[in-house]
């Protein structure tokens, strides 16, 4: 037994008294622990967030639950009504344990369920504003600056590649211009009035953006799809989540337009997309996100052992380019 696990066993009584539970066993699981209790299985894990962030996430989850979206990992509260417990100076959160499988984006049925659950979550999140005194993380309106910065980094990395001339650099220089073209198209669309209108609409309506809608945070249990891992949630246009889902699915199916339609139809059936959202989604999907990420990680790590790995990853991105461009050519016909 590791020192970490033995410390958790030593904290059993503290957890029981804080949550008014009786724990029969504590088992390590992933980054936390499964607790068998007299109130069902629970999942305890350390949270790297600040106390204010936990309070905000708890507030957001309560709003979702109170507005009909109950398939999520709500925080259990202590007898003092706190959504966390402090153990040896560290903050821990307790949630119901959801025993299911992580979403397989390569599986159409899983991806469609993920789109449906996302729409239901966004619908329930409307009108959300945090309680007084709780700071709301806000990324609203920062997309243009963020992508512009990444565009500048792509240009800067081109100059770096011209100086270095290694295997990775040659591949980068061979393809960078066409990815720059995609980035410029993306920023051109974002510079239109649609994005500004979406920002104003989101500010007016309120809402919850998950901000980390990835496979490990989408749990399938029988016919029910649970959304977990809300620690990055905040105020942002809702299509940020939908674009993340689409991008992950598209990379699993060579940017197949009919499969994108499956997800868009599943989402829109509950939450129709506006013309402004369709335009801004196009801008976001155009941006060569993975190309930037792979190159950025390579030029900022420069560990010799990683060069082969990053070169392979870059080659994968280059191989994907034609399918990506073809998909973007079909994008407007999806709506």
Predicted features, each with a name:
Residues 11-37:
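ATP-binding glycine-rich phosphate-binding loop
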Residues 33-36, 75, 188-239:
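Active-site acidic catalytic loop and adjacent metal/ATP-binding pocket
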Residues 40-133:
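ATP-binding pocket architecture of kinase catalytic cores
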Residues 45-48, 133-208, 311-317:
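ATP-dependent phospho-/nucleotidyl transfer catalytic cores
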Residues 92-105, 153-161, 245, 287-305:
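A glycine-centered beta->alpha junction motif in the catalytic cores
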Residues 239-272, 285-304:
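Active-site activation/catalytic loop segments of kinase-like enzymes and analogous catalytic loops
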């Amino acid at each position: 037994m590791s020192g970490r696990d033995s410390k958790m066993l030593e904290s059993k009584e503290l957890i029981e008294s804080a949550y008014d539970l009786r724990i029969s066993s504590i088992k390590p699981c992933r980054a936390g622990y499964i607790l068998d209790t007299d109130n069902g299985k629970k999942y305890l894990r350390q949270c790297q967030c600040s106390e204010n962030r936990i309070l905000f996430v708890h507030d957001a989850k309560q709003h979702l639950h109170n507005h009909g979206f109950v398939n999520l990992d709500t925080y259990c509260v202590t007898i003092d009504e706190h959504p966390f417990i402090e153990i040896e100076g560290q903050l821990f959160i307790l949630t119901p344990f959801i025993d299911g499988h992580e979403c397989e984006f390569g599986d159409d049925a899983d991806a469609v369920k993920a789109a449906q659950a996302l729409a239901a979550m966004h619908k329930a999140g409307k009108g959300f504003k945090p309680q007084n005194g709780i700071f709301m993380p806000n990324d609203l309106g920062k997309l243009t600056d963020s992508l512009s910065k990444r565009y500048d980094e792509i240009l800067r990395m081109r100059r770096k590649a011209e100086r270095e001339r290694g295997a990775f650099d040659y591949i980068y220089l061979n393809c960078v211009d066409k990815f720059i073209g995609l980035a410029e198209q993306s920023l051109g669309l974002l510079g239109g009035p649609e994005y500004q209108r979406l920002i104003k609409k989101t500010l007016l309506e309120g809402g919850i953006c998950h901000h980390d809608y990835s496979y490990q945070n989408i749990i399938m249990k029988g016919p029910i799809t649970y959304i977990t891992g809300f620690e990055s949630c905040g105020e942002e246009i809702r299509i940020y989540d939908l674009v993340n889902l689409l991008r992950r699915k598209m990379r699993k199916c060579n940017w197949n337009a009919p499969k994108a339609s499956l997800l868009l139809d599943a989402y829109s059936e509950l939450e129709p997309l506006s013309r402004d959202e369709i335009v801004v989604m196009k801008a976001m999907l155009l941006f060569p996100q993975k190309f930037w990420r792979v190159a950025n990680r390579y030029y900022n790590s420069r560990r010799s052992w990683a060069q082969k790995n990053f070169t392979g990853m870059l080659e994968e991105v280059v191989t994907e380019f034609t399918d990506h461009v073809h998909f973007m050519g079909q994008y407007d016909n999806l709506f």
